[in-house]
Regions:
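C-terminal helical cap(s) of enzyme catalytic domains, especially alpha/beta-barrels
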Residues: 140-160
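Active-site acidic/histidine proton-transfer and metal-coordination neighborhood
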Residues: 1-58, 67
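A short, structure-level motif marking secondary-structure boundaries and short turns
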Residues: 5-8, 61, 102-105
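Alpha-helical scaffolding segments of alpha/beta enzyme cores, especially the outer helices
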Residues: 13-23, 27, 42-50, 75, ...
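Conserved, mostly hydrophobic/aromatic
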Residues: 32, 61, 87, 122, ...
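Gly/Pro-rich active-site loop or hairpin
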Residues: 64-128, 136-142
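Short, histidine-centered active-site or binding-site loop motifs used for metal coordination
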Residues: 5-8, 131, 135-137
Length: 161
């Protein structure tokens, strides 16, 4: 699986490129997963449906939907459910800056993503993909990752040795 932010869509050139990459990924038994956040979920869904490649999928990042396009992640999950092959367990919180509000990344469970509902919806839609902890900008990297890992264990069964 290859995941990427592809920038704002629709873009005719990006449509052609994603079609080619999706088809190539499918031939090798994989996916090219577009990460959510550059656009509303409905725009991404239409883009993927327009391409119609079996190798094109979604890497669903709930924090990106909140921080980048001000969208409810649960609504995004339901719209994109047929295409999600991976999720990011990432959270964000709103902070005030000089003239506006912005979001910063925080350890999972310390922000605005309602993970109780998030994981219930993933279960309801039959999600069988990967859940990845993504870390971009924690203030304390080791503590933030440790918190996120411990938090994720509440929702994701771990393999016994």
């Amino acid at each position: 699986m290859v995941t990427a932010h592809i920038g704002k869509i629709p873009d005719d050139k990006m449509l052609r490129v994603c079609n080619e990459i999706g088809d190539l990924a499918f031939r090798f038994g994989g996916f090219f997963a577009i990460e959510t956040g550059s656009e509303k979920a409905i725009v991404l869904k239409r883009f993927i449906e327009n391409i119609n490649s079996k190798g094109l999928a979604v890497n669903f990042d709930p924090a990106n939907l909140i921080s980048d396009v001000n969208e409810n992640p649960v609504e995004g999950l339901l719209l994109l459910k047929d295409y999600i092959v991976q999720t990011h367990i990432k959270d964000c919180t709103k902070v005030k800056s000089d003239s506006s509000s912005k979001y910063i990344e925080v350890a999972a469970e310390n922000g605005e993503v309602d993970f109780d509902i998030f994981f219930k919806v993933l279960d309801k839609i039959g999600f069988q993909g990967y859940n990845m902890i993504e870390r971009n900008d924690y203030f304390d990297e080791l503590d933030g990752m440790s918190q996120s890992i411990n938090f994720a264990k509440k929702y994701i069964p771990t393999q016994k040795e």
